[in-house]
């Protein structure tokens, strides 16, 4: 499994609905870039200038909302993931 470093997290994207509320099926080109995901791995935290490590505010398993164009997309063992910095996370769901 991938292990993120520092204040980074690895997320699995939660795909958006393929149909509108009225039942119209959306083609891939019409779907918005996903902004929701589930954290599958989290780094050990950010290191301050003093050398002190600050733990992340999110945990593995959290569902999150993140900035629309944030992160780096990676493919690992046939699955697509997104690597984000903690500062790109806007909210935890639930």
From Swiss-Prot:
Protein family according to the UniProt entry: Belongs to the GroES chaperonin family.
SMART domains reported in the protein's UniProt record: Cpn10
Pfam families assigned: Cpn10
GO biological-process terms attached to the record: chaperone cofactor-dependent protein refolding
Gene Ontology molecular functions: ATP binding; metal ion binding; protein folding chaperone; protein-folding chaperone binding; unfolded protein binding
Keyword Translocase: no
The protein's role, per its UniProt record: Together with the chaperonin GroEL, plays an essential role in assisting protein folding. The GroEL-GroES system forms a nano-cage that allows encapsulation of the non-native substrate proteins and provides a physical environment optimized to promote and accelerate protein folding. GroES binds to the apical surface of the GroEL ring, thereby capping the opening of the GroEL channel.
Keywords from the UniProt entry: Chaperone, Cytoplasm
Major location category of this protein: cytoplasm
CDD domains: cpn10 (cd00320)
Name of the protein in its database record: Co-chaperonin GroES
Taxonomic superkingdom: Bacteria
Assembly and oligomerization: Heptamer of 7 subunits arranged in a ring. Interacts with the chaperonin GroEL.
NCBIfam families tied to this protein: PRK00364.1-2 (NF001527), PRK00364.1-6 (NF001530), PRK00364.2-2 (NF001531), PRK00364.2-3 (NF001532), PRK00364.2-4 (NF001533), PRK00364.2-5 (NF001534)
GO cellular component, one term: cytoplasm
